[in-house]
Amino acid sequence: MTSKAMLYFSYTKPKVWSLLVFVGAIGAVIAIPYFNLHYISLIVLATIAVMLGSMGAEATTNYIDKDIDAVMSRTMKRPLVTGQIKPINGLLFGLVLMFLSIAILAAFGKLYAALFMGIGLFDNVFIYSYLTKRRTPWNIILGGFSGGFPVVIGWYTVTSKFSILPWFLFLLVVVWIPIHVWSLAYRYRDDYNRAHVPMMTSIHNDRISAICISSAAIILFAFSIIPAFFRVMPMVYMILASAIAVPMIFYSIVFVRHPDRKNSLKLFIYSSPYLAIIFVLVLIFRFL
């Protein structure tokens, strides 16, 4: 891969969208009744579409946020800020990728998946980044729905049959996003204050922020075991999911008792693998 291609690839923030592509692929796999070449090709289609959409959304929001990125220490080295990529080129790159993500699904007749892709992109780019990020601390709640759509897109790329399972997973990701974003935002609250972005952690004191973040962690745990109560996952899944949640709940309690950046970072670091592990458990028990 050339240095220019690598630059544009890094511009899409692969560390951000890689987990979304993962849950999108899981959403496709759990929808198949058995493995054959046809279903494998649909899994690949879903994965490519989610990757294109996620890359496009991140590239476009980079354009929208370029003035914010310029004053935040965590983001001031991004390509639009440093001038490595011209703003118009960055915007067009993002728009083309988003268009391709919808077009490729529509071209293969996956209209439900294309519709959900469009809704997810609209929520991420317009509702979150353009409309609410600079105006309300509810920004990540209103814009968090976009993070749940990859699993639904994966499911409806494979089948048009309704199931409650992908929507449970959709809600799980939506609930996961606040704890993941807020625990990181707490660490960089000075950056958000400097950029005048009203994140929940930048407008409330340490204790309230810690309570909100830790409450989100408890809600995430509750949502992760709900599928067992609706009999779409076995009880052994609930037991394992509960065991995996113990460190997260522990870190949440510690964070409330001692709200500081060190403890918020511990919660942030654990939240990413937690979601991935839950999805792996769902995948395993789907086929057992």
UniProtKB/Swiss-Prot annotation:
<feature type="transmembrane region" description="Helical">
    <location>
        <begin position="162"/>
        <end position="182"/>
    </location>
</feature>
<feature type="transmembrane region" description="Helical">
    <location>
        <begin position="88"/>
        <end position="108"/>
    </location>
</feature>
<keyword id="KW-1133">Transmembrane helix</keyword>
<dbReference type="InterPro" id="IPR044878">
    <property type="entry name" value="UbiA_sf"/>
</dbReference>
<comment type="similarity">
    <text>Belongs to the UbiA prenyltransferase family. Protoheme IX farnesyltransferase subfamily.</text>
</comment>
<dbReference type="GO" id="GO:0048034">
    <property type="term" value="P:heme O biosynthetic process"/>
</dbReference>
<keyword id="KW-0472">Membrane</keyword>
<keyword id="KW-1003">Cell membrane</keyword>
<protein>
    <recommendedName>
        <fullName>Protoheme IX farnesyltransferase</fullName>
        <ecNumber>2.5.1.141</ecNumber>
    </recommendedName>
</protein>
<feature type="transmembrane region" description="Helical">
    <location>
        <begin position="111"/>
        <end position="131"/>
    </location>
</feature>
<dbReference type="InterPro" id="IPR000537">
    <property type="entry name" value="UbiA_prenyltransferase"/>
</dbReference>
<dbReference type="InterPro" id="IPR006369">
    <property type="entry name" value="Protohaem_IX_farnesylTrfase"/>
</dbReference>
<keyword id="KW-0808">Transferase</keyword>
<feature type="transmembrane region" description="Helical">
    <location>
        <begin position="37"/>
        <end position="57"/>
    </location>
</feature>
<dbReference type="GO" id="GO:0005886">
    <property type="term" value="C:plasma membrane"/>
</dbReference>
<feature type="transmembrane region" description="Helical">
    <location>
        <begin position="236"/>
        <end position="256"/>
    </location>
</feature>
<keyword id="KW-0350">Heme biosynthesis</keyword>
<feature type="transmembrane region" description="Helical">
    <location>
        <begin position="138"/>
        <end position="158"/>
    </location>
</feature>
<comment type="pathway">
    <text>Porphyrin-containing compound metabolism; heme O biosynthesis; heme O from protoheme: step 1/1.</text>
</comment>
<feature type="transmembrane region" description="Helical">
    <location>
        <begin position="265"/>
        <end position="285"/>
    </location>
</feature>
<dbReference type="Pfam" id="PF01040">
    <property type="entry name" value="UbiA"/>
</dbReference>
<feature type="transmembrane region" description="Helical">
    <location>
        <begin position="210"/>
        <end position="230"/>
    </location>
</feature>
<dbReference type="GO" id="GO:0008495">
    <property type="term" value="F:protoheme IX farnesyltransferase activity"/>
</dbReference>
<comment type="function">
    <text>Converts heme B (protoheme IX) to heme O by substitution of the vinyl group on carbon 2 of heme B porphyrin ring with a hydroxyethyl farnesyl side group.</text>
</comment>
<keyword id="KW-0812">Transmembrane</keyword>
<feature type="transmembrane region" description="Helical">
    <location>
        <begin position="16"/>
        <end position="36"/>
    </location>
</feature>
